[in-house]
Amino acid sequence: MRIAVPNKGRLHEPALELLERAGLHVQDGSDRKLYADTVDPEVSVLFARAADIPEYVADGAAALGITGLDQERESETDLVDLLDLEFGSCRLVLASPEDGGVSAPEELSGGTVATEFPKITERYFEELGVRPDIVEVSGATELTPHVDIADAIVDITSTGTTLRMNRLEVVDEVLESSVRLFADPAVADDPKVEQVTTAFRSVLDADGKRYLMMNVPEDSLDAVEAEIPGMGGPTVMDVAGQDTVAVHVVVDEREVFEVIPKLKAAGATDILVTEIERLVP
């Protein structure tokens, strides 16, 4: 089974890191290679442009693809969106010059809009009943309003810095995007696909969590349990030969700083905090 992964750019390293954390170490995934094996003999990696990945999956060259929702929507491939991988977040926005006088998309009827996403842009304006001339460009979209190529643009933004640097302001949000795990509909229910999806989900579920272990006198257990903000009831185990129990619990990382003094005050000792690599419910 092949997984298509971005071959370069801002999505490349996070995608490889996710594979690594999920237990699918990529063997010799150098920049110039098109294919690479993983430690699982049934899973290999195909490196491709992020924009091409939806087509590779739709054509059966890969069973799974890691790419942005914006790329899949632009490709019109109708893949199965299995999982939001929670990185590469961005927005596709309609923007125009700050002094251009465009305050609503309806004002662009009969105007010109430049974009690297012509299909998404066309659908967006069709839903609004607006008919601008859409010009496809392959880069430097934000410059087009300043050289009289377009009245507005539809482009990707993460922080808005590039738009502000080019004296552009957001008129409307077209699409909110992030990197997803997509599947060919023909194999979406395959057991191996489910195994990979579960592995990825376990990594995401572990993010922001910490595993707490502590020793607690039996007569302090109720007081300690009252201070535990964990995902569920803690695991409590007897410690041989002592009037003490070992308490294990998963908590949100942001709660650790506040909860440790409360646990100590309630009677817990030998508190150990560790990271969690993967969490499978």
Curated annotation (Swiss-Prot):
<dbReference type="InterPro" id="IPR018198">
    <property type="entry name" value="ATP_PRibTrfase_CS"/>
</dbReference>
<keyword id="KW-0328">Glycosyltransferase</keyword>
<keyword id="KW-0028">Amino-acid biosynthesis</keyword>
<dbReference type="GO" id="GO:0005524">
    <property type="term" value="F:ATP binding"/>
</dbReference>
<dbReference type="InterPro" id="IPR011322">
    <property type="entry name" value="N-reg_PII-like_a/b"/>
</dbReference>
<dbReference type="Pfam" id="PF08029">
    <property type="entry name" value="HisG_C"/>
</dbReference>
<dbReference type="InterPro" id="IPR015867">
    <property type="entry name" value="N-reg_PII/ATP_PRibTrfase_C"/>
</dbReference>
<comment type="function">
    <text>Catalyzes the condensation of ATP and 5-phosphoribose 1-diphosphate to form N'-(5'-phosphoribosyl)-ATP (PR-ATP). Has a crucial role in the pathway because the rate of histidine biosynthesis seems to be controlled primarily by regulation of HisG enzymatic activity.</text>
</comment>
<dbReference type="InterPro" id="IPR001348">
    <property type="entry name" value="ATP_PRibTrfase_HisG"/>
</dbReference>
<dbReference type="GO" id="GO:0003879">
    <property type="term" value="F:ATP phosphoribosyltransferase activity"/>
</dbReference>
<keyword id="KW-0479">Metal-binding</keyword>
<keyword id="KW-0368">Histidine biosynthesis</keyword>
<comment type="similarity">
    <text>Belongs to the ATP phosphoribosyltransferase family. Long subfamily.</text>
</comment>
<dbReference type="Pfam" id="PF01634">
    <property type="entry name" value="HisG"/>
</dbReference>
<dbReference type="InterPro" id="IPR020621">
    <property type="entry name" value="ATP-PRT_HisG_long"/>
</dbReference>
<dbReference type="GO" id="GO:0000105">
    <property type="term" value="P:L-histidine biosynthetic process"/>
</dbReference>
<comment type="pathway">
    <text>Amino-acid biosynthesis; L-histidine biosynthesis; L-histidine from 5-phospho-alpha-D-ribose 1-diphosphate: step 1/9.</text>
</comment>
<dbReference type="GO" id="GO:0000287">
    <property type="term" value="F:magnesium ion binding"/>
</dbReference>
<keyword id="KW-0460">Magnesium</keyword>
<keyword id="KW-0808">Transferase</keyword>
<dbReference type="InterPro" id="IPR013820">
    <property type="entry name" value="ATP_PRibTrfase_cat"/>
</dbReference>
<protein>
    <recommendedName>
        <fullName>ATP phosphoribosyltransferase</fullName>
        <ecNumber>2.4.2.17</ecNumber>
    </recommendedName>
</protein>
<dbReference type="InterPro" id="IPR013115">
    <property type="entry name" value="HisG_C"/>
</dbReference>
<keyword id="KW-0547">Nucleotide-binding</keyword>
<keyword id="KW-0963">Cytoplasm</keyword>
<keyword id="KW-0067">ATP-binding</keyword>
<dbReference type="GO" id="GO:0005737">
    <property type="term" value="C:cytoplasm"/>
</dbReference>
